[in-house]
């Protein structure tokens, strides 16, 4: 090892703090397994060794190595956060015993501390969300990485009419649940936590029978609208499960008429351990009447599909898939009932973009503002509600 490394490195390895740091970075094998070139680059980057003469491209290579080492720091490997947020490793805290690495300044770009818990992660995201549209409008900012800027020109002739129709339907009071029905209709006999557990159970039911995409969102909408209109004769687990299972059964038939070939009232009764298929059918009739037979209103999944319908390329399709998943999880949040489905859809797309962090992407952009009709400020409150559900 000494024949490979310069004397400066050998001297530093003799120091207790440095030796412990090498062990931390290299794993259980200690310094003997450490990549000497990587260690040498790191020590020079923090000023512990004199710098090598500059060579074309050398700074970028060294910076990449240092970033890789910093990202392996165990002190940042155990974030207790449910948001899989990626923070550039150059912004992470330094290893124990070492000074911070110099971060190249980016014009007008704020530097965020690495989140160390869920609260910090959410605050970092909200700061970036607030800043993203301002940065996107800066003449010196990089061009948006997505293709949304050209989407208005690619839209089908009827897109504007479809969008207007969806927006009108989502604002129709007859198609929306009450945002406070647990208190106003049921006098607190159903808690938000009980509702969340039941929605999760409904999700397992849709997966068990591989029901059509969109079934869960429509079923939860039916469930909330029904409970917004009717008090229950009892608030037992059996009664609530009957309402939830019937909502899934009704929504599944709306989404795909072929559902009747793999799922019927007898199967629902068996899955939910209800008395009989007749109990399910009776609840279905009661639910349809309470909903006024209005079954086709848009939901958050509808708008996620609508806003991402022109997604193309690997990164955009990944954002679309994750946004759908987050939208599914948001159904468990009672607080999301206070927002229009299009706002929830915009919020989950923003969270998905930030979580996956494709190169150059920001949580929001002027193109997304134009496409959805919402600014980052418009969706910020909903974003917080969704993040606190994950």
Swiss-Prot record:
CC terms in the record's Gene Ontology section: cyclin-dependent protein kinase holoenzyme complex; cytoplasm; nucleus
Disordered, as annotated region: 135-154
GO annotation terms (biological process): cell division; G1/S transition of mitotic cell cycle
SUPFAM superfamilies, sorted: Cyclin-like
Positions of disulphide bridges: none
Key words, A-Z: Cell cycle, Cell division, Cyclin
GO molecular function: cyclin-dependent protein serine/threonine kinase regulator activity
Record keyword Cell division present: yes
Family, as annotated: Belongs to the cyclin family. Cyclin F subfamily.
Record-linked PANTHER family: CYCLINS
Protein's name according to its UniProt entry: Putative cyclin-F2-1
The species this protein was found in: Oryza sativa subsp. japonica (Rice)
């Amino acid at each position: 090892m000494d024949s490979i490394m310069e004397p400066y490195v050998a001297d530093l390895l003799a120091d207790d703090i440095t030796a412990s740091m090498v062990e931390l970075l290299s794993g259980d094998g200690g310094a003997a397994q450490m990549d000497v070139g990587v260690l040498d680059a790191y020590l020079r980057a923090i000023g512990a060794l004199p710098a090598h003469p500059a060579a074309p491209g050398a700074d970028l290579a060294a910076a990449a190595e240092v970033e890789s080492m910093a990202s392996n720091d165990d002190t940042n490997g155990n974030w207790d956060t449910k948001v899989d947020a990626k923070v550039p490793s150059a912004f992470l805290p330094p290893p124990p015993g070492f000074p911070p690495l110099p971060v190249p300044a980016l014009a007008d770009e704020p530097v965020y501390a690495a989140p160390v818990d869920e609260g910090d992660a959410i605050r970092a995201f909200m700061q970036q969300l607030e800043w993203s549209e301002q940065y996107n409008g800066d003449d010196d900012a990089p061009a948006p990485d997505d293709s949304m800027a050209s989407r208005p020109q690619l839209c089908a002739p009827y897109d504007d009419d479809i969008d207007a129709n969806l927006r009108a339907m989502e604002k129709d009071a007859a198609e929306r649940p009450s945002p406070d029905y647990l208190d106003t209709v049921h006098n607190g006999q159903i808690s938000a936590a009980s509702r969340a557990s039941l929605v999760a159970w409904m999700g397992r039911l849709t997966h068990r029978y591989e029901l059509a995409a969109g079934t869960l969102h429509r079923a939860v909408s039916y469930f909330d609208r029904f409970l917004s209109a009717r008090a229950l004769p009892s608030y037992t687990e059996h009664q609530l499960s009957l309402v939830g299972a019937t909502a899934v059964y009704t929504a599944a038939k709306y989404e795909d008429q072929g559902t009747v070939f793999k799922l019927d009232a007898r199967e629902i009764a068996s899955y939910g351990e209800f008395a009989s298929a007749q109990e399910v059918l009776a609840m279905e009739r009661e639910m349809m009447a309470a909903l006024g037979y209005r079954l086709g209103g848009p939901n958050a999944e509808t708008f996620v599909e609508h806003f991402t319908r022109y997604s193309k390329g690997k990164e955009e399709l990944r954002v679309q898939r994750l946004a759908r998943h987050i939208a599914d999880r948001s159904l468990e949040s009672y607080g999301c009932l206070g927002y229009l489905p299009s706002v929830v859809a915009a919020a989950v797309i923003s969270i998905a973009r930030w979580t996956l962090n494709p190169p150059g992407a920001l949580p929001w952009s002027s193109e997304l503002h134009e496409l959805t009709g919402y600014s980052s400020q418009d969706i910020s409150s909903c974003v917080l509600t969704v993040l606190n559900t994950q």
